[in-house]
Amino acid sequence: MKSFDEMTPKEIVQELDKYIVGQYEAKKAVAIAVRNRIRRQKLPEEWRKEVLPKNILMIGPTGVGKTEIARRLAQLSGSPFLKVEATRFTEVGYVGKNVDSMIRDLVEISVNMVKQEKIKEVERQAEELVEERILDALVPESKAVPVVTNPFINLITGGQQQQYTPEDRRRFRAKREEMREKLRKGELENEEIEIELEETVSPFMGIFGPGMEDLGIEITNMFSGMLPKQKKKRKMKVSEARKVLLPLEAEKLIDMDKVVQEALDRAQNRGIIFIDEIDKIAGKESAVGPDVSRQGVQRDLLPIVEGTTIMTKYGPVRTDYILFIAAGAFHVSRPSDLIPELQGRFPIRVELSPLTEEDFVRILKEPENAIIKQYQALLSTEGVELVFTEDGIREMARIAYQLNQRLENIGARRLYTVAEKVLEEISFEAPDIPEKRIVVDAEYVRRRLERIVQDEDLSAYIL
């Protein structure tokens, strides 16, 4: 498979098609946006500064694939990705999260992403160090023979000097190698050992009220280097110790300065922020009530989307080249209800169409992570072969579509509730079923859902 930087917009859309049904226009828009980033990197320096990403506004009801398109695109491109709800933010001066926090969160995600990549590179080396630490716990050094020395030296050194006889050393090495052999064969995984771990005690967390969590985290990070690291001994099995020690030893091998530098560059030039429910902060200004800070949030959001510098604990971050994808249903408000300056910062607008019954059939069958494929994989672990007939799939799609028309339209998410109810009994009985091949056809689906679908009150609560 090609690297992402070599993929054409058409190929990016084809990759997204593996996971998301339909919505061609939205896929096309995001594919062009990320391809333009790659094109920008190839420009001369003076042009590179001038080319800014074209932010995207997705308009469409819930459950049609807005978030999934952005998330899959980020996974495909290896970009740091953050999803936020516009309604979570408040205008500066009000209690709550301010919009700057989304950039700090994006940088945190980017640092963790790069850190995990670097840890992967040194994993083999870290495994060797973990093995040595486990062996230290399994075969502790025996007490050496005390040597009589000058009492004055004993007073300074805090005790008598120790030394090992050659025979002690030989026995110790032989025992250690014997245990190493057993450890590598997996014979000691259930042995209990005592290991020493470092932990930083934070006296600041828990004293900040709602809406001030960011301040608490910032203060904790500021003082984390000054706080003493306490050493604590813990007893655990060798298998558990391996999991605990591996990231600790790997972290010692990576250069955190380089990690931060790469992470900042990645967040600034490849970061994607998905702002959901932006329609909820659109609308006319209200002087009182819960809507008092709607336009304030939009105005706070404006400089970040336009391009500004935000201070984070890792250093300053420029937001000019971060790709912002905003989304909303816009049932009550319209995109034109956003403040004009913010509208201008989302020049690409794509409308996602509501899902049809035929789309539901395709969603159940076609994506690589299709719902029925997930259930088949889960139940195969119990030795159960789950077979869905074409009419069974169509019946599930029909019922989900009808429920969306009768109750609230939640898009493809309705399929999860329908599938869960259809397969509830099978999932519960799976380990004890004598018949290991189960066929889910239209008759089976109707039998499982008939009573619930007919009773509107039950449908509202259960499906």
Curated annotation (Swiss-Prot):
It holds the Pfam family AAA_2. The keyword tRNA-binding does not apply. It is found in: Cytoplasm. GO terms for biological process: protein unfolding; proteolysis involved in protein catabolic process. Keywords: ATP-binding, Chaperone, Cytoplasm, Nucleotide-binding, Stress response. It comes from the Bacteria. ATP binds at residues 21, 63-68, 276, 341, 413. GO terms for molecular function: ATP binding; ATP hydrolysis activity; peptidase activity; proteasome-activating activity. One of its GO terms (cellular component) is HslUV protease complex. NCBIfam families: hslU (TIGR00390), PRK05201.1 (NF003544). ATPase subunit of a proteasome-like degradation complex; this subunit has chaperone activity. The binding of ATP and its subsequent hydrolysis by HslU are essential for unfolding of protein substrates subsequently hydrolyzed by HslV. HslU recognizes the N-terminal part of its protein substrates and unfolds these before they are guided to HslV for hydrolysis. This is ATP-dependent protease ATPase subunit HslU. It comes from Thermotoga sp. (strain RQ2). The lineage of its organism: Bacteria, Thermotogati, Thermotogota, Thermotogae, Thermotogales.
